[in-house]
């Protein structure tokens, strides 16, 4: 009898341990998915995410918390910190179609800032652990999925640093097959394409590469029809485009190039960007909003829209008052959902700062005037925007 009671107790303990294991934190699974033992995602019946709600419902609620608040959310307790760091909420947001736009910009060597247009909130990113050469050299930036890629130059070579919104830290990542600067770039979901630019020896490139954020690897693509530097890139209607730039120190490129991801071929579009680039000028400032292409003509401070059918540009209206740019350098012109953002310097009675202006193309233009709205102001950072990227995820 004693042996039987002891055996029953062992079975009870084993069952209890099994139940406890099935109720443990399994944050690497999506809602509704099961692990190898058939356990659904849960954070424990006795340790629920939000008291009074089943875990799946609670996780759906937390998925709507703005991503700019994740650092605060992760400080609530160890459970929330583990949930945030697992990346489960990031995946769940994608499933639910939740998109929040975050702006990353740098205005001085002190470091990067993050701005939430939705919350009108500025935040300081952790300091990038790069060397001083990279910190002070010219850089280019690109947002891919939930990563910010920063391209620059160290003492003897090009380098790429990556900031992960998920881990909230910087890491040095794999370089391109053909390292370069002054290139065209654009991103679509979890991929990005870079094309053209200049290598370490000053050679102007026609090569292009594709970056996959899921693997962190670069893949060579077919060459463009012509080499070019100081050019701009963007995705529109699911295809990648390159416009502007120079094929030699004195020759501007006026035709555009379109890359089809399915056929893996480039197509020339004659006269797509007839403006003549100069060596001292910035690359074309372009954005795509709702698959419509816009450019900021910094010589006239006018916003223009591209007519895909006529292959022509039409004037929409004027920029808001701002500090004059230096041949287009120091300005940022970026898309943000259905809005178009301009980051420019202003001087006022309280000093210098950066003003974020927005315009919705759907509102149109009235007598050449665009309805600009101020989204935010960052004071005491100078009037020059060195780099800027917008992340939507």
UniProtKB/Swiss-Prot annotation:
SUPFAM superfamilies: F-box domain, Kelch motif
Organism domain of life: Eukaryota
Listed Pfam families: F-box (PF00646), Kelch_1 (PF01344)
GO CC entries: nucleus
Intervals holding Kelch repeats: 88-142, 144-190, 191-238, 240-286, 288-336
Keyword Repeat found: yes
InterPro entries: F-box-like_dom_sf, F-box/Kelch-repeat, F-box_dom, Kelch-typ_b-propeller, Kelch_1
UniProt keyword Protease, yes or no: no
Keywords of this entry: Kelch repeat, Repeat
Domain F-box residues, every copy: 48-95
Protein name, per record: F-box/kelch-repeat protein At5g60570
């Amino acid at each position: 009898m004693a042996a039987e009671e002891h055996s029953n107790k062992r079975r009870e303990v084993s069952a209890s341990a099994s139940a406890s294991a099935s109720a443990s934190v399994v944050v690497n699974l999506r809602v509704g998915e099961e692990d190898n033992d058939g356990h659904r995602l849960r954070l424990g019946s006795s340790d629920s995410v939000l008291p009074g709600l089943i875990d799946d419902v609670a996780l759906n609620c937390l998925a709507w918390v703005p991503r700019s608040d994740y650092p605060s959310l992760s400080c609530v307790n160890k459970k929330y910190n583990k949930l945030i760091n697992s990346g489960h909420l990031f995946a769940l947001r994608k499933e639910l179609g939740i998109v929040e736009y975050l702006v990353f910009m740098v205005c001085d060597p002190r470091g990067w800032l993050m701005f939430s247009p939705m919350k009108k909130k500025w935040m300081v990113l952790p300091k990038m652990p790069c060397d001083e050469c990279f910190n002070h050299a010219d850089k280019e930036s690109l947002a891919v999925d939930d990563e910010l890629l920063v391209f620059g130059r160290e003492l003897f070579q090009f380098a790429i640093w990556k900031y992960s919104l998920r881990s909230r830290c910087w890491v040095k990542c794999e370089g391109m097959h053909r390292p370069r600067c002054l290139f065209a770039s654009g991103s679509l979901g979890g991929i990005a394409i870079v094309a053209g630019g200049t290598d370490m020896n000053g050679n102007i490139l026609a090569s292009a590469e594709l970056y996959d954020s899921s693997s962190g690897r670069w893949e060579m693509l077919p060459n463009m029809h012509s080499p070019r530097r100081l050019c701009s890139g963007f995705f529109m209607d699911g295809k990648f485009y390159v416009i502007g730039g120079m094929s030699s120190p004195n020759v501007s490129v006026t035709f555009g190039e379109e890359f089809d991801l399915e056929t893996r071929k480039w197509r020339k579009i004659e006269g797509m960007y007839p403006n003549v680039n100069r060596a001292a000028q910035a690359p074309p400032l372009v954005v795509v909003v709702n698959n419509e292409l816009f450019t900021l003509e910094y010589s006239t401070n006018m916003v223009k829209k591209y007519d895909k059918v006529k292959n022509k540009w039409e004037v929409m209206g004027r920029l808001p008052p701002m500090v004059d740019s230096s041949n287009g350098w120091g300005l940022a012109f970026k898309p943000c959902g259905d809005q178009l953002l301009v980051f420019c310097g202003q001087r006022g009675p309280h000093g210098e700062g950066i003003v974020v202006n927005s315009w919705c193309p759907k509102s149109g233009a009235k007598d050449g005037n665009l309805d600009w709205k101020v989204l935010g102001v960052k004071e005491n950072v100078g009037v020059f925007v060195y780099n800027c990227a917008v992340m939507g995820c």
